[in-house]
A protein has these predicted regions:
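Conserved MFS/SLC helix-loop-helix module at the cytosolic interface between two early adjacent transmembrane helices
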Residues: 46-84
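Helix-loop junctions on the cytosolic side of multi-pass membrane transporters
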Residues: 167-180
Length: 195
């Protein structure tokens, strides 16, 4: 669950040291290259808003697993990218996949752990969410010291594979049926609070 909650920070911050290299590799202006981050964040935000609703309807664990498969596919597409458009398509897939992690990992924790264990689990998830943005750029720079820029996306792909292997199924979590009222969570108050 900690890995699931951390994937968005990893995907956002690990590529920061790569941006100048991407500009040279694709012979593009810097504003276009910055779409790899700004575009990611826009799609990621929309994905977060929808993932909780979809998770309630289809099952949180199922949606979380599907989202990491999307993130894996996006990471591999970025790894193989030979054009900026291919890279941006991969980043879009990554963003859609990353959106479910922070939302559903906490929801699954609440359904899986006892109240005492839940406090510890949520504390660990929050700590990881704070630490990963600090470590990710350093990890990206370290990778660039030995490998080419696209290997950063291979590391992200491996991260998603590890997260899938450490699925919450191992915690004994089973998706529960959604309450009938869960489909009505998008209310005027919700929209006003979001804005």
């Amino acid at each position: 669950l900690i890995l699931a909650a951390s994937v968005s920070a990893l995907a956002t911050d690990m590529i920061v040291p790569v941006l100048p290299l991407l500009q040279k590799a694709f012979h593009s202006d810097y504003s276009s290259i910055q779409l790899t981050i700004s575009g990611f964040l826009v799609i990621y935000a929309c994905s977060q808003l929808l993932s909780g609703f979809i998770g309630e309807k289809l099952g949180k664990l199922r949606v979380l697993t599907a989202s990491f498969l999307l993130f894996l596919a996006g990471s591999l597409l970025c790894f193989m990218a030979d054009s900026l458009s291919m890279l941006l398509a991969g980043r879009a897939l990554q963003a859609v996949g990353a959106g479910a992690g922070p939302v559903l990992s906490k929801a699954i924790a609440k359904e899986t752990f006892s109240p005492l264990t839940l406090k510890r689990a949520l504390s660990d998830i929050s700590s990881a969410s704070a630490v990963v943005p600090l470590i990710a750029p350093l990890a990206g720079a370290a990778i660039l010291g030995h490998l080419s820029w696209n290997h950063i996306f291979l590391v992200m792909a491996l991260f998603s594979v590890v997260t899938l292997l450490l699925s919450p199924r191992r915690l004994g979590h089973r998706d529960s049926a959604a309450a009938p009222s869960s489909s009505l969570f998008i209310t005027p108050a919700f929209i006003q609070g979001t804005l």
